[in-house]
Amino acid sequence: MIWHVQNENFILDSTRIFMKAFHLLLFHGSFIFPECILIFGLILLLMIDLTSDQKDRPWFYFISSTSLVMSITALLFRWKEEPIISFSGNFQTNNFNEIFQFLILLCSTLCIPLSVEYIECTEMAITEFLLFVLTATLGGMFLCGANDFITIFVAPECFSLCSYLLSGYTKRDVRSNEATTKYLLMGGASSSILVHGFSWLYGSSGGEIELQEIVNGLINTQMYNSPGISIALISITVGIGFKLSPAPFHQWTPDVYEGSPTPVVAFLSVTSKVAASASATRIFDIPFYFSSNEWHLLLEILAILSMILGNLIAITQTSMKRMLAYSSIGQIGYVIIGIIVGDSNDGYASMITYMLFYISMNLGTFARIVSFGLRTGTDNIRDYAGLYTKDPFLALSLALCLLSLGGLPPLAGFFGKLHLFWCGWQAGLYFLVSIGLLTSVVSIYYYLKIIKLLMTGRNQEITPHVRNYRRSPLRSNNSIEWSMTVCVIASTIPGISMNPILAIAQDTLF
C-alpha cells in the first residue's frame, strides 16, 4: 500500500515537472529558437544513425551543416530585436550575446567540411563526432546568453565534456590519451575553482544568482568592497582563465593541440575562446562593476604574460600544431585588451571584429595542416620545406593565413590588430599596447620562418615527405578545399573594407 502511494506521488511529481518544462518551452521557446534547431538536428542524427547503414554517411554531414546554417539564419532574422530575459531570468537575448553565438555557429559550420576527409581517412566514428560537435556548439551558445550562475556553470560543462571526448577521440593514440587526461583533470579543477568564486558572490549578495540582481544585492548588503569579493574575483578569473587559456593558465593547451585530432583542435581553438570571451565580458562588467580597477589589473597581467610567453615560446617549437598552440596564447592576449577597454572606446567592437578575423585565419591554417598531414603523416615544421614546388595552392593559402595571423598589411589580421591596439591606446593602456606591438613583430618572425621553408627550392632542404607528396586535385566536391578557400578569402579581403564589420559590431548594445 505504501509502495502504491509512493509510486503515485512519483508519477504526479514527474508529470508536474514535465508540464512545467513543456510550459517553459511553449512560451519561451521562441527566444532559443536557434538552439532548438540544433537540438532537433541532434535528435535527427541519432534517429538516422539507428535506422541506417554506412551508405548514408553523407546524410550525417548534410544534416549537421544544415542545422548550423538554419540556426545562423534564425539568428540573423532575430537581429536588432529588443533585449529579452527569459526562462525565469536564466537566459538573456540581445545583440551582444547573439553576435558571439553567430561566431560560434560560424566556427562549427566551417569545421564540419574541414573534418570530412580526415574522418574518412582515419575511419573515425562519424555520428558520435558530429554529435559532440553540435552539442559543444549548443553549450557554447547557451553560455553566450547565460544570465545566472547555474546556466553559466552548466553551459560550459556541456561544452567541456564534449571537448574532452573529442580530444580523446583517437583512443589508440598515446598522445591523445595523455592530452585528454591533462585536459580533463585541469578542466575539473578549474570548474571547482569557478564554482567557489560563484559561492562567494552568492553569499555576499544575499543569495542572488542573476547577474544584475547580484549587483543590487551587493549594494543592499554593502559587501561590494569586502574581502569576499576579492576572493570571488580571483577564483572566477582562474576558472575563466582555463577556458581562455592565457598564461599562466595555458598548461593544457600545447598538449591538447599536439595530441588531439587536427579537426578537433581547429574546432576547440576558436569556439572555446569565443564562448569564454562572451562569458568573461558579462561576468567582469556586471557583478564586478564595483571592482573594475582590480579586474582590469588582473587581466592586464594575464594579457602581458600571454603576449610575451606565447610568442617567445612559439619560436622554439618544431611541431606545427604546438607552435599554433603557443601562438593562440599570444592571440588571446590581444583579445584581452578589448575586454579591458570594454564598452568605451569601441573595445568590445574591436574585440569582436578581431575574433571574426581570427576565426578565418586560424581555421584556414588548420585546414592546410589537415590536408598536409593526411598526405604525409607528419606535423614537423621542417617537413613543410619545399611544399610550394609540389602544391603551390596549398603553400600559398597557408602562407596567406600565417601572414594574416602575424598582422602584415593589407591582410585582415593587420587591420584587426590595428583597430584593437588603437582602442587600447585611446583608453590609456600604453604599456599594454606597446607590449602587443613588440610581440606582434616577434610573431611575424616565426611565421615568416615557416613561409621561407614553404617556398624553398633547394633539394637538400626538401624532406622525403614532400618529395613523395601526392597533390590533392581541386574538385568541386572536396569539402576541405571549400572550407579553406572561404577562410583564406575572409583572411584577406575583409581587412581592406572592414568599416561595415565594425559598424555591425558597434551596434551590439551590452
Swiss-Prot record:
<keyword id="KW-1278">Translocase</keyword>
<dbReference type="GO" id="GO:0019684">
    <property type="term" value="P:photosynthesis, light reaction"/>
</dbReference>
<dbReference type="Pfam" id="PF19530">
    <property type="entry name" value="Ndh2_N"/>
</dbReference>
<feature type="transmembrane region" description="Helical">
    <location>
        <begin position="124"/>
        <end position="144"/>
    </location>
</feature>
<dbReference type="InterPro" id="IPR010096">
    <property type="entry name" value="NADH-Q_OxRdtase_suN/2"/>
</dbReference>
<dbReference type="Pfam" id="PF00361">
    <property type="entry name" value="Proton_antipo_M"/>
</dbReference>
<feature type="transmembrane region" description="Helical">
    <location>
        <begin position="24"/>
        <end position="44"/>
    </location>
</feature>
<dbReference type="GO" id="GO:0009535">
    <property type="term" value="C:chloroplast thylakoid membrane"/>
</dbReference>
<feature type="transmembrane region" description="Helical">
    <location>
        <begin position="295"/>
        <end position="315"/>
    </location>
</feature>
<feature type="transmembrane region" description="Helical">
    <location>
        <begin position="149"/>
        <end position="169"/>
    </location>
</feature>
<keyword id="KW-0934">Plastid</keyword>
<feature type="transmembrane region" description="Helical">
    <location>
        <begin position="323"/>
        <end position="343"/>
    </location>
</feature>
<keyword id="KW-0521">NADP</keyword>
<feature type="transmembrane region" description="Helical">
    <location>
        <begin position="99"/>
        <end position="119"/>
    </location>
</feature>
<dbReference type="InterPro" id="IPR001750">
    <property type="entry name" value="ND/Mrp_TM"/>
</dbReference>
<keyword id="KW-1133">Transmembrane helix</keyword>
<feature type="transmembrane region" description="Helical">
    <location>
        <begin position="418"/>
        <end position="438"/>
    </location>
</feature>
<dbReference type="GO" id="GO:0008137">
    <property type="term" value="F:NADH dehydrogenase (ubiquinone) activity"/>
</dbReference>
<keyword id="KW-0813">Transport</keyword>
<keyword id="KW-0520">NAD</keyword>
<comment type="function">
    <text>NDH shuttles electrons from NAD(P)H:plastoquinone, via FMN and iron-sulfur (Fe-S) centers, to quinones in the photosynthetic chain and possibly in a chloroplast respiratory chain. The immediate electron acceptor for the enzyme in this species is believed to be plastoquinone. Couples the redox reaction to proton translocation, and thus conserves the redox energy in a proton gradient.</text>
</comment>
<protein>
    <recommendedName>
        <fullName>NAD(P)H-quinone oxidoreductase subunit 2, chloroplastic</fullName>
        <ecNumber>7.1.1.-</ecNumber>
    </recommendedName>
</protein>
<keyword id="KW-0618">Plastoquinone</keyword>
<keyword id="KW-0150">Chloroplast</keyword>
<feature type="transmembrane region" description="Helical">
    <location>
        <begin position="183"/>
        <end position="203"/>
    </location>
</feature>
<comment type="subunit">
    <text>NDH is composed of at least 16 different subunits, 5 of which are encoded in the nucleus.</text>
</comment>
<dbReference type="GO" id="GO:0048038">
    <property type="term" value="F:quinone binding"/>
</dbReference>
<dbReference type="GO" id="GO:0042773">
    <property type="term" value="P:ATP synthesis coupled electron transport"/>
</dbReference>
<feature type="transmembrane region" description="Helical">
    <location>
        <begin position="347"/>
        <end position="367"/>
    </location>
</feature>
<comment type="similarity">
    <text>Belongs to the complex I subunit 2 family.</text>
</comment>
<feature type="transmembrane region" description="Helical">
    <location>
        <begin position="229"/>
        <end position="249"/>
    </location>
</feature>
<keyword id="KW-0812">Transmembrane</keyword>
<dbReference type="InterPro" id="IPR045693">
    <property type="entry name" value="Ndh2_N"/>
</dbReference>
<keyword id="KW-0472">Membrane</keyword>
<keyword id="KW-0874">Quinone</keyword>
<feature type="transmembrane region" description="Helical">
    <location>
        <begin position="395"/>
        <end position="415"/>
    </location>
</feature>
<keyword id="KW-0793">Thylakoid</keyword>
<feature type="transmembrane region" description="Helical">
    <location>
        <begin position="59"/>
        <end position="79"/>
    </location>
</feature>
